A protein has these predicted regions:
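N-terminal non-catalytic accessory region
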Residues: 2-134
Length: 134
């Protein structure tokens, strides 16, 4: 029986064969930001330290990819949020700041205009000259 770490490594090796552009020799020069889905969690959430969303029981996929030389980061957006709210939260997390959902949106859906504060940007130098892969 293979360990979770062995299964993770095998899965990633198969992925490199199927997607050669994702291999270290063909990697993008930009950071890759992983954004979890509904009911998920990211690196800023306490649960991530115990059970990383990207890998779960198999281990920390992003930690493995970073150790292989990739620049991978895990965003933390609302676990049950609209696409609008998640986009606002992701932008605030990428750039550093507080999620601003807008006055009209907040009034229409009956929630606060401002959400989570992200004092430290996930990608400090993100901009036109430094894009990210999502």
């Amino acid at each position: 029986m293979k360990t979770p770490q062995q299964l993770l490594q095998q899965t990633l090796e198969v992925g490199e064969c199927l997607l050669p552009d994702a291999s270290p020799g063909g990697r993008t020069p930009y950071p890759t930001v992983f954004v979890h889905g509904l009911l998920g969690w990211g690196a800023r959430d306490a649960l991530y330290r115990a059970v990383p969303y990207w890998g779960l029981a198999a281990g920390d996929v992003l930690g493995y990819l970073n150790a292989c030389g990739y620049d991978c980061r895990a965003a933390s957006v609302g676990i049950i949020s609209s696409a609008w709210d998640r986009a606002c939260e992701l932008y605030a997390e990428l750039t550093g700041g507080t999620a601003d959902y807008g006055i009209a949106h907040a009034q229409r859906f009956g929630h606060a205009r401002f959400g989570t504060a992200y004092p430290n940007p996930l990608v400090p130098d993100w901009g036109a000259d430094r894009p990210v892969d999502l």
